[in-house]
Amino acid sequence: NTTAVNGEGGSKYIDAARNVVIKDTVKYAHLPIKHDFKLRGTLVFQSSGEPVLLNDKPIVVEKSFTAKKAEGSIDMEFVFDASGLQGKKIFVFEELFYENQTIAAAVHKDLGDVGQTVTVSNPKVKTVASNKVDGSKMLEPDKRVTILDTVSFSGLIEGHTYKVSGTLMDKATGNPVVDESGETIT
């Protein structure tokens, strides 16, 4: 029995960011006591079973342990860059070996197991700016106005804190708009 979750909060979602953590808890049973084992976990894409790569190498974590009881659990943490993986489902393959053996004593590679799957968030943001007075897109030149920017979003991770900030941009030039004192309008 295994469970993969966000290592920083326990949800089934991780941010599309650098240095994210997937915590994989592997529960075992019927192991011979006082024997040495090695647990190997590999991150793969659920859609294909192909490994998730970091610097062109599969992301693999190995952990050695001695079974103190026939039943127990082991945690493994995978730290990696998920910034380009928005919307992807990541699965953890596990293999259990007797120490110094090359053939796995137990394998868990069922891509359909939702307990082993973590989804990389795919946040979307949309803004609609309008004249606060009448809701139109028209502003009077040379008059002080307030622009209301309505922000809508989806795909955020529940329980995470996000910050919304904006800068008024000149559509024609692509440059920030500045006020009479030269300050960028935010």
Predicted regions and their residues:
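Solvent-exposed loop/turn and edge beta-strand elements of beta-rich ligand-binding domains
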Residues: 1-186
